[in-house]
């Protein structure tokens, strides 16, 4: 289950755009071995709101493109498909029948800015940011170079499989 909450008014959000991002999320989850009914919240915000959230949660007072709030714990350098192969979850990890993976907060305003900066489509940038964030929900990180390489490789593999190119 993907819950979409549009909390901004600067960018138009069509059903087609929302459906596309939901399909991207579902595909990324499947590719990462999430074979259980799950829940992700996808929030669309503007630069001001993501700046406020970034400041409140990370003590960084600036806008960013996407924030991820994973609900599951992972051992260092391990991801979902390496840790939860037996679907060994506690009851607290669920909302009804759905495993709660976490929240994705996406600044659509920043996604548009970056699409222009990187000279590719807005849809491609939003798709990339959603894949990036979903991978964070599944335990990926990019603080160390080795982890960054692993994460970037998975991002590109997923986007390429979806035929979403620069």
Curated annotation (Swiss-Prot):
Q: Outline what the protein does.
A: Single strand-specific metallo-endoribonuclease involved in late-stage 70S ribosome quality control and in maturation of the 3' terminus of the 16S rRNA.
The cofactor required is: Zn(2+)
UniProt EC number = 3.1.-.-
Q: How is the cofactor bound?
A: Binds 1 zinc ion.
GO BP: any one term = rRNA processing
Chain residues that bind Zn(2+): 132, 136, 142
Principal location class? cytoplasm
**Similarity annotation:** Belongs to the endoribonuclease YbeY family.
Name recorded for this polypeptide: Endoribonuclease YbeY
**Organism this protein belongs to:** Clostridium botulinum (strain Eklund 17B / Type B)
- Gene of this entry: ybeY
């Amino acid at each position: 289950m993907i819950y979409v909450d549009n909390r901004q008014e600067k960018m138009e959000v069509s059903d087609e755009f929302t459906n596309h991002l939901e399909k991207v999320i579902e595909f990324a989850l499947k590719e990462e071995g999430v074979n259980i009914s799950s829940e992700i919240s996808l929030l669309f915000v503007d630069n001001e709101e993501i700046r406020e959230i970034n400041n409140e949660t990370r003590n960084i007072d600036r806008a960013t493109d996407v924030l991820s709030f994973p609900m599951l714990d992972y051992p260092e350098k391990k991801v979902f498909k390496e840790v939860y192969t037996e679907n060994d979850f506690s009851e607290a990890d669920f909302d009804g029948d759905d495993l709660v993976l976490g929240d994705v907060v996406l600044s659509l305003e920043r996604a548009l800015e970056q699409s222009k900066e990187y000279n590719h489509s807005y849809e491609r940038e939003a798709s990339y940011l959603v894949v990036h964030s979903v991978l964070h929900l599944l335990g990926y990180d990019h603080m160390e170079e080795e982890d960054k390489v692993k994460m970037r490789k998975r991002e590109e593999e997923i986007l390429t499989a979806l035929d979403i190119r620069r």
